[in-house]
Amino acid sequence: MKKKILASLLLSTIVLSVGAQVASAENLESSKTTGDVTFIHGGKPDVTKPEEGPKEDGEILEDDLDEDGNPIPLPNNGGIYVMHLPNFSFGDKNQTSVKTKEYPAVTEERKLKDTKESFYMPHSVQVSDVSGNENATWKLSVVQDAPFESKDNSKLTNTRIRIFGNTFTNTLHDSNALAEKITGVGLDTSDTASANYSAIPVAGAEEGALTVLENTVKGFTNASTTSAVFSNGYLEENYSPEKTNAAEAYEGVKLNVPASDQAKAKKYTTQLTWTLAVEPGVSELAPTE
């Protein structure tokens, strides 16, 4: 008899338990699942023509190449990449003078990546930020390694490259949004001979380095490309293989040659060093090699 009562109680318990589960399932109106994603900083993107933003599909240009057609290694740090650095040429028909004189630079040759068509535009620098680092700021600066010098060791000791113009572009933001966030060449020096400018200093001359492009707000440039074009009022539509297919002098960059340097009728050259500084440096997660 006791066994029958116990079995009956167990059966009742099971039936009640199942009934409770069915009732619970019938009354459940919603449930949750999860989703997740983790990012690491991106690889080097394409070089693009400096254009007013926001614009993600700008014209793609060739990488900076050496004389053998190989890509030139450019500074990078934690997903922040220098995309383009300029070579400055001031032409080969400059007349010497008894006075201090400024010689304008000639526009720089750039090439479309797909068609290899050339066009010429003012000198520029470009930095892409795919760091994914919300705290990152960065600065690109330049210094001239030594005075202009000829093969027979004649030097232009006090000759300096001067920058007279600046236009900033960014692929995520229009120019108005860049104010006080993107800075660069200060154009804060003047003399009686020319308009305001900034000079590229010579190393070892206690002149420091010249900042040419800087993001001053943490994370502002993440997922974008920023350019500084050394010309006031630069508009990208003015430069193309159809419109500017030959080099020409322009006023944004000039070489200031004092009479005291006594320039000779010969070719002078120099080298420039460009440095990228990133804070706080490498982001938390980086691609594995």
Language-model features: locations:
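Bacterial Sec-dependent N-terminal signal peptides
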Residues: 1-8
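Signature of Gram-negative chaperone-usher
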Residues: 7, 21-289
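Bacterial N-terminal signal peptides
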Residues: 11-17
